[in-house]
Regions:
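N-terminal membrane topogenic signal
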Residues: 1-15, 75-78, 137
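Alpha-helical transmembrane segments in multi-pass membrane proteins
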Residues: 6-58, 83, 106-107, 111, ...
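Aromatic-anchored segments of alpha-helical transmembrane domains
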Residues: 17-26, 85-93, 146-155, 197-206
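Small-residue-rich transmembrane alpha-helices that serve as helix-helix interface/gating elements
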Residues: 44-48, 171, 214-234
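Membrane-interface capping segments at transmembrane-helix boundaries
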Residues: 60-66, 230-240
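Membrane-interface helix caps and helix-loop-helix hairpins in membrane proteins
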Residues: 92-106, 156-163, 207-214
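Membrane-interface helix/loop boundary segments of multi-pass membrane proteins
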Residues: 121-144, 184-188
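Functionally important transmembrane alpha-helices
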Residues: 166-221
């Protein structure tokens, strides 16, 4: 395999995806943390998901195959809480909120699915997998793809987000390490899409339908930090 063209195609995929996201942010002018974000953003996010699929299919498909099966092995069960905890948050909201609207729920669901597909294909496939296929070590590929994933969220500046973006960059870097490590261990793009989808769906619904933002932060931040520490310890032990 000629590695340079593949690396170039991976970078082109990430660049085009990021450009489209920034243009969408500039047009909408609504921040990611805004309760109305998902409702306004979902047509753009579906477009981004289609773009990510098209970029993989046209540029990367021949060199980077995708595995959609999920193996119920040790690594799956170790990481299962990262799926179940946002699910419990969603159940809590569904049973306690009196302001749920079916139309908004459908939009949040569609947006979250699209986010999971778009960002995992871009940063775990065009990022991590391409880096791995072009000679990077697993450790380097995980950390660099997580950094790219974090820096991508600078696009929120286009929507007017201020210094609070620093904390978002830190959280997204940690989550990027966790997702890339889980992808390395499971080799299942479907599983990391599901994790990404569940976290975004819980974020959108909790912020839109409740005043439980503090509960969301109290639950989600320790989980992300805990799994980041677990993933980083294992990443740093890797010899390849």
């Amino acid at each position: 395999m000629n590695k340079s063209p593949l690396l170039f195609k991976g970078l082109i995929s990430i660049g085009i995806f990021t450009l489209f996201a920034v243009l969408g942010m500039l047009h909408l002018g609504v921040q990611y943390i805004d309760p109305s974000f998902a409702a306004l953003w979902y047509p753009y996010e579906i477009g981004l998901a289609v773009t990510a699929v098209a970029l993989w299919y046209t540029l990367l498909r021949k060199e980077i195959a995708l595995n959609f099966s999920i193996n119920f092995n040790k690594d799956f069960f170790i990481t299962l809480p990262i799926v179940l905890i946002p699910l419990l948050l969603l159940v809590y909201v569904l049973f306690t909120s009196e302001t749920l609207e079916n139309e908004k729920l459908a939009m949040f669901f569609a947006t979250s699915v699209a986010v999971g597909i778009a960002e995992e294909l871009t940063f775990r496939v065009a990022g991590y997998r391409v880096l791995l296929a072009t000679g990077s070590s697993v450790k380097k590929a995980i950390l660099l793809s997580a950094l790219l994933f974090s820096l991508f969220h600078l696009s929120n500046i286009a929507a007017g987000q201020g210094v609070e973006i620093i904390s978002q960059l830190a959280i997204t870097f940690m989550m990027g390490v966790v997702l890339a490590y889980i992808y390395y261990k499971t080799e299942s793009i479907l599983y990391v899409i599901i994790i990404h989808f569940m976290w975004d769906l819980s974020l959108f619904i909790v912020t839109a339908f409740t005043n439980a933002d503090s509960l969301l932060n109290a639950v989600s931040i320790p989980i992300v930090i805990g799994y980041f520490i677990w993933a980083m310890k294992n990443v740093l032990k890797l010899k390849k």
